[in-house]
Amino acid sequence: MDLDLVLITGMSGSGKSVALHALEDAGYYCVDNLPPELLTAFIALQHEQQATRVAIAMDVRSGVSLPIVPQQLEALRQDGVSLRSLFLDATTDALLRRYSETRRRHPLSRQEGRNDVPEQERVLVQAIELERELLADLRDGADVIDTSLIRPAQLQSYIKALISAPQSSALTLVFESFAFKRGVPLDADYVFDVRMLPNPHYVPALRPLTGRDAPVVEWLREHDDVARMYDDIEQFLSRWLDALARDHRSYVTVAIGCTGGQHRSVFLVEQLARAFGTRWVALKRHRELDAG
């Protein structure tokens, strides 16, 4: 079955509609909130119509039908469907902020006309926690994208970059820099802490620059600890990536964090993406730089 299928799931308020619009712009036929009971028949219909690119969004509104989805996805893979499952996630604080800004109601929220703000937030937190429990199995079987700190336009660009990765590649690597002070990315498969490395922040001439700028690159390359850290990460990934590919992983996110997400982590992400890009599809994300 020559069909490229992308399944979008995730937390309410995490950006699923934005992701679906990005896929639509990329030429996918998109369906939002398809009931799981109709998935197999829908895919069979797309095959009859010789569709080649289809994207489906599912979420917690599917309710009691959600547990059947993982088995359905495995059956589709066995039938030869090229399937990529993406789960959009965000921190509870980020979701609370978005609901506060949009004043939309969470699909699992039972608040009816409550005017007490603390009580509204308490009920919303309960709804978010329940949703996490209901979607746990779907999250475990998907490639997770943390949208907590990225804008809609950035999410659209990132989704398009992911789906444009060659299908012939066994694995797509995503190298992501971040600042520990703003939290560890939820989508990280591996996290490396490089805060112990020499910090260009304390060099006045380098402070306003980033790990992509030549003066910072040259300064970091002069320090042996930086080279040793790079070698250790490179050797670890080289040892295990083939095993991850054999385990049918589509994406692996390697997050590298420093204090501000501006110099050391950015430098290492750039270097590692360049090195691994010779064999694998390697994408880069600089969370703090991209956030402006």
UniProtKB/Swiss-Prot annotation:
Q: Does the keyword Nucleotide-binding apply?
A: yes
Give residues annotated as binding ATP.
10-17
Q: Which Pfam families match?
A: PapZ_C, RapZ-like_N
Q: Which GO terms describe its molecular function?
A: ATP binding; GTP binding
Signal peptide per UniProt:
none
Sorted alphabetically, the keyword list is: ATP-binding, GTP-binding, Nucleotide-binding
| Domain of life of the organism encoding this protein | Bacteria
Listed binding positions for GTP are 59-62
Under NCBIfam families, the record lists: PRK05416.1
Stated role:
Displays ATPase and GTPase activities.
Q: Which family does it belong to?
A: Belongs to the RapZ-like family.
Q: What is this protein called?
A: Nucleotide-binding protein Vapar_4338
Please report the organism this UniProt entry assigns to the protein: Variovorax paradoxus (strain S110)
